[in-house]
């Protein structure tokens, strides 16, 4: 239980994961320029950069950073900034939650994994989430064994009188 609390404290300290990788892409500077151009339409642009509820593993961090680079590049080329708020909301509400869960749940996480605190861009080892948290409603191996033993026992109990009757 204390490992879940430690994981929750760690996840609360995470911000703007997309800025930790590929410094040559200069995502924070590019996003700041786009936000300054969109100041009238989207007042909370720079506030939306913080992703305080997420932590990502190495592969997910690379995917999100590369995806954000490509989206910003398309916006810069086309000069169309109106899709920036919808991309940022999609990133926060859908993709980061998915990658965060993927990093902390089986099969990709076994025992513990390294997640990156994006406010410092340093990796920390955290324990994986239990299977019941990752897949609520699914049965774990112990419950499957109990169910299998119950079915076998019932079959034997019904089989013995059936054999005696025959």
Curated annotation (Swiss-Prot):
Tissue specificity note: Detected in testis and brain with higher levels in brain than testis.
TM helices/strands, residue ranges: 146-165
Disulfide bonds: 17-118, 20-121, 105-128, 109-134
Biological processes annotated in GO: fusion of sperm to egg plasma membrane involved in single fertilization; single fertilization
Coiled-coil residue windows: none
Ranges facing Cytoplasmic side: 166
Signal peptide location: 1-16
Membrane disposition: Single-pass type I membrane protein
Record localization: Cytoplasmic vesicle, Secretory vesicle, Acrosome membrane
Extracellular side: 17-145
GO CC, any one term: acrosomal vesicle
Glycosylation: residue positions: 117
Domain of life: Eukaryota
InterPro entries: TMEM95
Post-translational modification: N-glycosylated.
Keywords: Cytoplasmic vesicle, Disulfide bond, Fertilization, Glycoprotein, Membrane, Signal, Transmembrane, Transmembrane helix
PANTHER family on file: SPERM-EGG FUSION PROTEIN TMEM95, TRANSMEMBRANE PROTEIN 95
Function summary: Sperm protein required for fusion of sperm with the egg membrane during fertilization.
Identification of the protein by name: Sperm-egg fusion protein TMEM95
């Amino acid at each position: 239980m204390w490992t879940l609390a430690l994981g929750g404290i760690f996840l609360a300290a995470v911000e703007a994961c997309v800025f930790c990788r590929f410094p040559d892409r200069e995502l924070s500077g590019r996003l700041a320029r786009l936000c300054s151009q969109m100041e009238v339409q989207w007042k909370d642009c720079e506030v939306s950069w913080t992703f305080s509820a997420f932590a990502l593993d190495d592969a997910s961090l690379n995917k999100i950073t590369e995806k954000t680079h490509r989206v910003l590049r398309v916006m810069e080329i086309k000069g169309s900034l109106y899709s920036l708020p919808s991309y940022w909301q999609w990133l926060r509400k859908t993709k980061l939650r998915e990658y965060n869960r993927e990093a902390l749940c089986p099969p990709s996480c076994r025992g513990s994994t390294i997640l990156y605190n994006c406010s410092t861009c340093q990796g920390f080892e955290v324990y994986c989430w239990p299977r019941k948290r990752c897949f609520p409603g699914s049965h774990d191996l112990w419950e499957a064994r109990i169910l299998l033993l119950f079915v076998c026992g019932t079959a034997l109990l019904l089989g013995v009188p059936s054999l005696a009757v025959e």
